[in-house]
Amino acid sequence: MSTQYIDETAFVQAEQGKTNLMFSDEKQQARFELGVSMVIYKWDALDVAVENSWGGPDSAEKRDWITGIVVDLFKNEKVVDAALIEETLLYAMIDEFETNVEDDSALPIAVEVINIYNDCFNLNYNKVEKLYLEWQEKQRTKKSKRVVHIEGDDDEDDEDVEDYDDEDEDEEMDEVVPDLVSSKPEPIVDEDGFELVQPKGRRKH
Protein backbone atom coordinates (compact mmCIF):
# COMPACT_ATOMS: atom_id res chain seq x y z
CA MET A 1 0.00 0.00 0.00
CA SER A 2 1.45 3.36 -1.02
CA THR A 3 1.61 6.19 1.46
CA GLN A 4 0.38 9.59 0.35
CA TYR A 5 3.08 12.23 0.57
CA ILE A 6 2.20 15.22 2.73
CA ASP A 7 4.22 18.38 2.15
CA GLU A 8 4.49 20.01 5.57
CA THR A 9 6.10 23.08 3.97
CA ALA A 10 3.20 23.74 1.57
CA PHE A 11 2.19 27.40 1.35
CA VAL A 12 0.54 29.96 -0.90
CA GLN A 13 1.50 33.60 -1.39
CA ALA A 14 -0.48 36.54 -2.71
CA GLU A 15 0.36 37.83 -6.15
CA GLN A 16 2.39 41.00 -6.38
CA GLY A 17 0.29 44.05 -5.59
CA LYS A 18 -2.34 42.13 -3.64
CA THR A 19 -2.72 42.44 0.13
CA ASN A 20 -4.43 39.09 0.69
CA LEU A 21 -5.20 35.74 -0.92
CA MET A 22 -8.87 36.30 -1.73
CA PHE A 23 -9.97 35.56 -5.28
CA SER A 24 -11.46 38.53 -7.09
CA ASP A 25 -13.73 36.23 -9.10
CA GLU A 26 -16.83 35.36 -7.06
CA LYS A 27 -17.16 31.83 -8.45
CA GLN A 28 -13.51 31.14 -7.72
CA GLN A 29 -13.86 32.37 -4.14
CA ALA A 30 -17.12 30.48 -3.64
CA ARG A 31 -15.58 27.22 -4.89
CA PHE A 32 -12.58 27.72 -2.61
CA GLU A 33 -14.74 28.36 0.44
CA LEU A 34 -16.85 25.31 -0.38
CA GLY A 35 -13.69 23.26 -0.76
CA VAL A 36 -12.42 24.38 2.64
CA SER A 37 -15.78 23.44 4.15
CA MET A 38 -15.72 19.99 2.61
CA VAL A 39 -12.14 19.31 3.72
CA ILE A 40 -12.85 20.35 7.30
CA TYR A 41 -16.13 18.41 7.33
CA LYS A 42 -14.25 15.20 6.61
CA TRP A 43 -11.76 15.70 9.48
CA ASP A 44 -12.48 12.71 11.70
CA ALA A 45 -11.36 14.36 14.95
CA LEU A 46 -13.78 17.25 14.43
CA ASP A 47 -16.56 14.99 13.19
CA VAL A 48 -16.36 12.88 16.37
CA ALA A 49 -16.40 16.04 18.50
CA VAL A 50 -19.51 17.32 16.72
CA GLU A 51 -21.34 13.98 16.75
CA ASN A 52 -20.76 13.68 20.50
CA SER A 53 -21.59 17.36 21.16
CA TRP A 54 -18.29 17.98 22.93
CA GLY A 55 -18.77 21.64 22.10
CA GLY A 56 -22.25 21.76 23.56
CA PRO A 57 -25.60 21.99 21.75
CA ASP A 58 -24.15 24.31 19.10
CA SER A 59 -21.29 21.95 18.16
CA ALA A 60 -22.35 21.88 14.49
CA GLU A 61 -22.33 25.68 14.38
CA LYS A 62 -18.84 25.66 15.89
CA ARG A 63 -17.62 23.44 13.07
CA ASP A 64 -18.88 25.99 10.54
CA TRP A 65 -17.20 28.74 12.56
CA ILE A 66 -13.89 26.86 12.37
CA THR A 67 -14.33 26.69 8.61
CA GLY A 68 -14.89 30.44 8.63
CA ILE A 69 -11.72 31.26 10.53
CA VAL A 70 -9.65 29.13 8.15
CA VAL A 71 -11.17 30.99 5.19
CA ASP A 72 -10.44 34.27 7.00
CA LEU A 73 -6.73 33.42 7.03
CA PHE A 74 -6.75 33.76 3.25
CA LYS A 75 -8.76 36.98 3.45
CA ASN A 76 -6.40 38.60 5.93
CA GLU A 77 -2.93 37.28 5.11
CA LYS A 78 -0.54 37.58 2.18
CA VAL A 79 1.09 34.24 2.97
CA VAL A 80 -0.64 31.18 4.41
CA ASP A 81 1.19 27.92 5.04
CA ALA A 82 0.15 24.48 6.25
CA ALA A 83 1.61 25.11 9.71
CA LEU A 84 -0.58 28.19 10.23
CA ILE A 85 -3.73 26.32 9.21
CA GLU A 86 -2.81 23.33 11.38
CA GLU A 87 -2.18 25.59 14.37
CA THR A 88 -5.50 27.37 13.80
CA LEU A 89 -7.37 24.07 13.69
CA LEU A 90 -5.73 22.69 16.82
CA TYR A 91 -6.32 25.84 18.88
CA ALA A 92 -9.95 25.93 17.71
CA MET A 93 -10.45 22.34 18.86
CA ILE A 94 -9.12 23.22 22.30
CA ASP A 95 -11.09 26.46 22.61
CA GLU A 96 -14.39 25.22 21.20
CA PHE A 97 -14.45 21.50 22.03
CA GLU A 98 -11.94 21.24 24.89
CA THR A 99 -10.20 18.58 22.83
CA ASN A 100 -6.45 18.28 22.40
CA VAL A 101 -5.89 16.52 19.06
CA GLU A 102 -2.57 14.68 19.25
CA ASP A 103 -2.83 12.27 16.32
CA ASP A 104 -1.30 14.67 13.75
CA SER A 105 -4.53 14.47 11.74
CA ALA A 106 -4.79 18.26 11.44
CA LEU A 107 -1.72 18.48 9.20
CA PRO A 108 -3.14 16.52 6.24
CA ILE A 109 -6.28 18.65 6.49
CA ALA A 110 -4.17 21.81 6.42
CA VAL A 111 -2.17 20.63 3.42
CA GLU A 112 -5.34 19.70 1.57
CA VAL A 113 -6.70 23.22 2.13
CA ILE A 114 -3.52 24.58 0.50
CA ASN A 115 -3.99 22.16 -2.40
CA ILE A 116 -7.61 23.23 -2.80
CA TYR A 117 -6.49 26.86 -3.00
CA ASN A 118 -3.97 26.02 -5.72
CA ASP A 119 -6.60 24.07 -7.66
CA CYS A 120 -9.04 26.97 -7.49
CA PHE A 121 -6.28 29.39 -8.49
CA ASN A 122 -5.86 27.29 -11.64
CA LEU A 123 -9.66 27.13 -12.16
CA ASN A 124 -9.62 23.40 -11.46
CA TYR A 125 -12.70 22.56 -9.40
CA ASN A 126 -12.66 18.79 -9.86
CA LYS A 127 -11.49 18.07 -6.32
CA VAL A 128 -14.02 20.48 -4.80
CA GLU A 129 -16.85 18.90 -6.78
CA LYS A 130 -15.71 15.40 -5.79
CA LEU A 131 -15.60 16.33 -2.10
CA TYR A 132 -19.02 17.97 -2.35
CA LEU A 133 -20.60 14.89 -3.94
CA GLU A 134 -19.01 12.67 -1.28
CA TRP A 135 -20.42 14.92 1.44
CA GLN A 136 -23.88 14.81 -0.16
CA GLU A 137 -23.77 11.02 -0.30
CA LYS A 138 -22.73 10.87 3.35
CA GLN A 139 -25.68 13.08 4.30
CA ARG A 140 -28.06 10.85 2.32
CA THR A 141 -26.69 7.77 4.06
CA LYS A 142 -27.14 9.34 7.49
CA LYS A 143 -30.70 10.36 6.63
CA SER A 144 -31.53 6.88 5.33
CA LYS A 145 -30.21 5.26 8.49
CA ARG A 146 -32.29 7.66 10.60
CA VAL A 147 -35.46 6.81 8.68
CA VAL A 148 -34.84 3.07 9.02
CA HIS A 149 -34.16 3.45 12.75
CA ILE A 150 -37.21 5.61 13.43
CA GLU A 151 -39.67 3.57 11.39
CA GLY A 152 -38.18 0.23 12.40
CA ASP A 153 -38.43 -0.91 8.79
CA ASP A 154 -35.79 -3.30 7.49
CA ASP A 155 -36.93 -2.87 3.90
CA GLU A 156 -33.93 -1.81 1.82
CA ASP A 157 -36.22 0.49 -0.19
CA ASP A 158 -35.89 3.05 2.62
CA GLU A 159 -32.29 3.54 1.60
CA ASP A 160 -33.04 4.47 -1.99
CA VAL A 161 -31.20 7.59 -3.07
CA GLU A 162 -32.66 10.08 -5.52
CA ASP A 163 -30.82 10.50 -8.80
CA TYR A 164 -28.46 13.45 -8.78
CA ASP A 165 -28.91 15.89 -11.63
CA ASP A 166 -25.47 16.96 -12.87
CA GLU A 167 -26.95 20.02 -14.57
CA ASP A 168 -27.90 21.46 -11.18
CA GLU A 169 -24.49 20.77 -9.63
CA ASP A 170 -23.01 24.25 -10.10
CA GLU A 171 -26.16 25.96 -8.82
CA GLU A 172 -26.38 23.74 -5.74
CA MET A 173 -22.69 24.17 -4.95
CA ASP A 174 -23.03 27.94 -5.14
CA GLU A 175 -26.02 27.85 -2.80
CA VAL A 176 -24.35 25.68 -0.16
CA VAL A 177 -21.36 27.98 0.39
CA PRO A 178 -23.28 30.70 2.30
CA ASP A 179 -24.77 27.97 4.51
CA LEU A 180 -21.41 26.48 5.45
CA VAL A 181 -19.24 29.61 5.51
CA SER A 182 -21.12 32.61 6.84
CA SER A 183 -19.97 35.76 8.59
CA LYS A 184 -23.50 36.38 9.90
CA PRO A 185 -25.39 34.02 12.21
CA GLU A 186 -28.11 32.10 10.40
CA PRO A 187 -30.89 29.97 11.94
CA ILE A 188 -29.49 26.60 12.93
CA VAL A 189 -31.90 23.66 12.70
CA ASP A 190 -31.13 20.36 14.39
CA GLU A 191 -31.76 16.90 12.95
CA ASP A 192 -35.31 16.84 14.34
CA GLY A 193 -36.27 20.09 12.64
CA PHE A 194 -36.12 22.34 15.70
CA GLU A 195 -34.40 25.72 15.46
CA LEU A 196 -31.54 26.15 17.91
CA VAL A 197 -31.01 29.39 19.80
CA GLN A 198 -27.64 30.80 18.79
CA PRO A 199 -25.35 32.56 21.27
CA LYS A 200 -24.92 36.29 20.81
CA GLY A 201 -21.54 37.66 19.76
CA ARG A 202 -18.63 35.90 18.14
CA ARG A 203 -16.23 33.50 19.68
CA LYS A 204 -12.67 34.57 20.16
CA HIS A 205 -10.02 33.53 17.65
Curated annotation (Swiss-Prot):
GO terms for cellular component: cytoplasm; nucleus. It is found in: Cytoplasm; Nucleus. It comes from the Eukaryota. GO terms for biological process: maturation of LSU-rRNA from tricistronic rRNA transcript (SSU-rRNA, 5.8S rRNA, LSU-rRNA); maturation of SSU-rRNA from tricistronic rRNA transcript (SSU-rRNA, 5.8S rRNA, LSU-rRNA). Its main location: cytoplasm. Residues 152-177 have a biased composition (Acidic residues). Keywords: Cytoplasm, Nucleus, rRNA processing. Interacts with RPS26A. Present with 13400 molecules/cell in log phase SD medium. Belongs to the TSR2 family. Required for 20S pre-rRNA processing. This is Pre-rRNA-processing protein TSR2. The lineage of its organism: Eukaryota, Fungi, Dikarya, Ascomycota, Saccharomycotina. The gene is TSR2.
